[in-house]
């Protein structure tokens, strides 16, 4: 079944190529080139826009990003350690001191 689909798709591609649908040369002139305008950094006239003002959030950024994700990471690791201990995969022992 898969081989038949491959044969049919190749035959369809060849028929479209013969009809000029896929391999036809472009009718656009290569002498006219379109220059893209990057509106984020330049105006339509080509001048560079001034650098935008940077707004610093400082401690607000620390409190809203770092601290909640540290707390979530702590909860995940605590729950995973409890799961390992519950299934006797890793049980910490105090008898490891062989000094």
Swiss-Prot record:
A family per Pfam: DDDD
Any GO CC annotation of this UniProt entry: mitochondrial inner membrane
Side of membrane Mitochondrial intermembrane, spans: 78-99
Sequence ranges on the Mitochondrial matrix membrane side: 40-57
Keyword terms of this UniProt record: Calcium, Calcium transport, Ion transport, Membrane, Mitochondrion, Mitochondrion inner membrane, Transit peptide, Transmembrane, Transmembrane helix, Transport
Span of the transit peptide along the chain: 1-39
Subcellular location: Mitochondrion inner membrane
Transmembrane segments: 58-77
Record bears the keyword 4Fe-4S: no
Any GO BP: mitochondrial calcium ion homeostasis
GO molecular function, one term: channel activator activity
Bridged cysteine pairs (disulfide): none
Lineage top rank: taxon: Eukaryota
Subunit note: Component of the uniplex complex.
Protein role: Essential regulatory subunit of the mitochondrial calcium uniporter complex (uniplex), a complex that mediates calcium uptake into mitochondria. Required to bridge the calcium-sensing proteins micu1 with the calcium-conducting subunit mcu. Acts by mediating activation of mcu and retention of micu1 to the mcu pore, in order to ensure tight regulation of the uniplex complex and appropriate responses to intracellular calcium signaling.
Family from the record: Belongs to the SMDT1/EMRE family.
Protein name: Essential MCU regulator, mitochondrial
Provenance organism: Xenopus tropicalis (Western clawed frog)
